[in-house]
């Protein structure tokens, strides 16, 4: 009887349900398993950029994951210039223009006399490509379209393969455009940019106000000055910064004291407010610039200088009222919204890799191409458009440039020339690593442990007809 009872007890025990209580959302084990938006961004970059950049991706990745990146200081021309320069130099900072001129002179004075021009040109190309000597051959834009993520992305209406969207831009990959060499990078007289040498991670002191009541210098990522320099600003230029927030590049342009007209535009009120804040903090005697500086809130895809800017600015620019009936912009900076590759690895806030922004991220190249296309359509003959992103994505970089050039060629009779700036940038290779990962149109400064700034892609396009 006892044996029977024991068997029954065992059967009843076997039927008992064991209830397991999960840990709360804030428990360390749950948090550890939870994938953040930053994790998703890194996973995407590993899958995508690993294929595009080959073995070089590992070192780029290491630099990107370091939270503190390297800045340069743009001296405020509206403050006490000589004092500021002296103070920055006392901290060990060097003037970027001086560095460029020293290395440019060294290159000019030490050509190889014993070798043919062909050999020297080959060596120059090898130096530019030295960064990727260990990378996979022929990776880059041509191999980009083979990238297919392992997972599908749920859109609002249907399932979308990320590669299907990117594949749309394959159409412009083989589009040919005239190419012209640029041999010199021009530094405007009043644009003073200071940096620390390679492997020096010193931080600039906090900027203080000078005798004119504005801050002494503006800190920005060291690679962000390159698109501004590529504009090749000249006295009297009319300049448009299409996507200007937070305002660092607009401010850098103003520091040259060259623009006769400066228009800083962005699409949202909050972003426009950031531009205005920077201008108020750094531009003294704003009244003197009231008739030359304008901050606008417009969608860059639909800016029409013959219409919108004539209406917005003719009340300020009486002298130019008639000129605004035709195209007037001689320089346009197109620093488009992008995946902001460094930022998304260090901030959860409003991260473009969060699920709610999937469709926005997939549509980025389409948006970028539309903005660049519009810029190319409104630039004046002889004018320069500089397109830039802080992304490593060949789709957002060369891919977008190719699509925009193709569209302009199809829809207008304009003639565009893409500037090959390899020679002009060569003296800056002491500070920047310019990777040539199959790029056809532009240039890219990639992050390194020695100088951890960037990434920054930029492409200079000039309209000749």
Language-model features, listed with the residues they occupy:
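Glycine-rich nucleotide cofactor-binding entry segment
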Residues: 4-7, 11, 15-256, 265-285, ...
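Short glycine-centered segments of the SAM/dcSAM-binding site in methyltransferase folds
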Residues: 238, 261, 382-384
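Conserved nucleotide-binding/hydrolysis micro-motifs of P-loop NTPases
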Residues: 269-270, 301-302, 338-340, 392-394, ...
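C-terminal catalytic and target-recognition region of SAM-dependent MTase-like enzymes
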Residues: 319-322, 326, 385-465
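Beta-strand cores of modular interaction/reader domains in eukaryotic scaffold and signaling proteins
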Residues: 72-74, 241, 263, 294, ...
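Mobile active-site "lid"/loop adjacent to the S-adenosyl-L-methionine
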Residues: 257, 298, 309-374, 382, ...
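Helix N-cap motif at beta-to-alpha junctions
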Residues: 77-81, 345-346, 465
């Amino acid at each position: 009887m006892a044996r029977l009872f024991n068997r029954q007890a065992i059967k009843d025990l076997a039927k008992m349900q064991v209830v397991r209580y999960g840990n709360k959302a804030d428990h360390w084990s749950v948090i550890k398993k939870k994938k953040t938006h930053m994790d998703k961004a890194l996973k995407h970059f590993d899958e995508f950029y690993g294929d595009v950049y080959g073995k070089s991706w590992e070192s780029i990745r290491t630099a990107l994951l370091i939270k503190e990146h390297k800045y340069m200081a743009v001296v405020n021309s509206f403050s006490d210039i000589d004092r500021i320069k002296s103070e920055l130099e006392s901290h060990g900072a060097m003037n970027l223009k001086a560095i460029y001129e020293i290395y440019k002179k060294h290159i000019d004075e030490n050509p190889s006399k014993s070798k043919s021009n062909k050999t020297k040109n080959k060596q120059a190309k090898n130096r530019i490509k030295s960064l990727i000597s260990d990378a996979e051959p022929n990776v880059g834009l041509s191999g980009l379209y083979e990238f297919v993520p392992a997972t599908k992305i749920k859109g609002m209406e249907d399932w979308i393969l990320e590669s299907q969207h990117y594949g749309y831009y394959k159409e412009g990959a083989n589009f040919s455009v005239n190419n012209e060499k640029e041999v010199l990078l021009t530094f405007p007289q009043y644009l003073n940019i200071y940096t620390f040498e390679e492997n020096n991670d010193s931080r600039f002191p906090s900027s203080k106000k000078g005798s004119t009541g504005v801050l002494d210098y503006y800190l920005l990522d060291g690679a962000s000055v390159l698109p501004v320099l590529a504009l090749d600003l000249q006295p009297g230029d009319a300049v448009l910064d299409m996507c200007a927030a937070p305002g660092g590049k607009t401010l850098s342009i103003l520091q040259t004291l060259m623009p006769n007209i400066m228009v800083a535009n962005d699409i949202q009120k909050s972003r426009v407010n950031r531009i205005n804040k920077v201008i108020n903090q750094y531009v003294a005697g704003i009244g003197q610039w009231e008739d030359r500086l304008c901050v606008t809130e417009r969608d860059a895809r639909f800016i029409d200088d013959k219409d919108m800017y004539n209406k917005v600015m003719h009340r300020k620019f009486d002298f130019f009222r008639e000129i605004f009936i035709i195209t007037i912009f001689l320089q346009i900076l197109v620093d488009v919204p992008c995946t902001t590759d460094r930022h998304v690895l260090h901030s959860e806030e409003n991260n473009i890799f969060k699920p709610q922004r999937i469709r926005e991220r997939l549509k980025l190249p389409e948006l970028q191409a539309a903005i660049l296309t519009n810029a190319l359509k409104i630039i004046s003959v002889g004018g320069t458009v500089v397109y830039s992103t802080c992304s490593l994505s060949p789709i957002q970089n060369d891919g977008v440039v190719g699509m925009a050039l193709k569209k302009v060629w199809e829809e207008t009779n304009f003639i565009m020339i893409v500037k090959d700036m390899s020679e002009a940038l060569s003296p800056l290779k002491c500070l920047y690593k310019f990777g040539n990962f199959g790029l056809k149109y532009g240039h890219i400064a990639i992050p390194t442990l020695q100088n951890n700034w960037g990434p920054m892609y930029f492409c200079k396009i000039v309209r000749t007809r």
